[in-house]
A protein has these predicted regions:
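Short cysteine-rich clusters marking metal-coordination/redox-active sites
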Residues: 23-26, 68-71, 92, 132-135, ...
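Short Cys/His-rich Zn2+-coordinating modules
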Residues: 2-10, 45-56, 72-79, 112-119, ...
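Short, structured motif recognition centered on aromatic/hydrophobic residues
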Residues: 28-31, 36, 91, 97-105, ...
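Short, flexible, mixed-charge glycine/proline-rich loop motifs
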Residues: 13-17, 53-65, 82-86, 119-128, ...
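Residues immediately within or flanking Cys/His clusters that coordinate Zn2+
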Residues: 20, 28, 65, 89, ...
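Terminal recognition/anchoring or ligand-binding modules at protein termini
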Residues: 94, 109-111, 122, 137, ...
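Cys/His-rich microdomains that often coordinate metals
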Residues: 1, 30, 75, 98-99, ...
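Short cysteine/histidine-rich zinc-coordinating motifs and their immediately flanking basic loops
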Residues: 6-15, 35-43, 80-86, 104-108, ...
Length: 147
């Protein structure tokens, strides 16, 4: 993972900075406890730009068991819900933070939403396959929605 410093919200305590750990190969971001909420709107745009600049990195699938970078204990898969949909994150039981795939982060921030059943059916009539946002593998949308 690479560390990147982005602007945080200024809560009257001076200019805040948020340091995120980003894995471009596995397309994931480690957020220390509640760090995802501390990003300023400009920092979210900066982060999307950074992710776009590294879009050609060779991708690695996520490991079956992810570990907290602070305590090395296993992360537990869980879901969060926002207006744009439900998305998966991997949490540390010790509340050190969470790991989020780039695609989940985009859902969290409202830039991406899940397709409705009617939209999936319409897309399945027009295309044979879509590609996994995690590993890039083709997915037959007529049968599956994820790899």
């Amino acid at each position: 993972m690479e560390a990147h410093r982005l602007d945080g919200h200024d809560h009257g305590l001076g200019h805040g900075v948020v340091e995120l750990d980003i894995c471009f190969a596995c397309q994931g971001i480690w957020f220390d406890h509640r760090e995802n909420l501390k990003l300023s709107p400009q920092a979210v745009v900066e982060l999307f730009t950074l992710l776009h600049q590294h879009r050609t990195y060779e991708r690695r699938p996520l490991q079956r068991q992810l570990a907290c970078p602070r305590c090395v204990r296993p992360l537990a898969p869980s879901f969060d819900v926002v207006r744009s949909g439900r998305y998966m994150v991997y949490r540390c039981a010790q509340q050190h933070g969470r790991f989020s795939a780039f695609s989940s982060f985009m859902v969290e921030k409202g830039f991406v939403r899940h397709l409705t059943r009617a939209e999936v059916d319409d897309l399945a009539r027009r295309v044979d396959a879509i590609y996994c946002t995690g590993c890039g593998s083709p997915v037959d949308i007529r049968k599956d929605h994820a790899c």
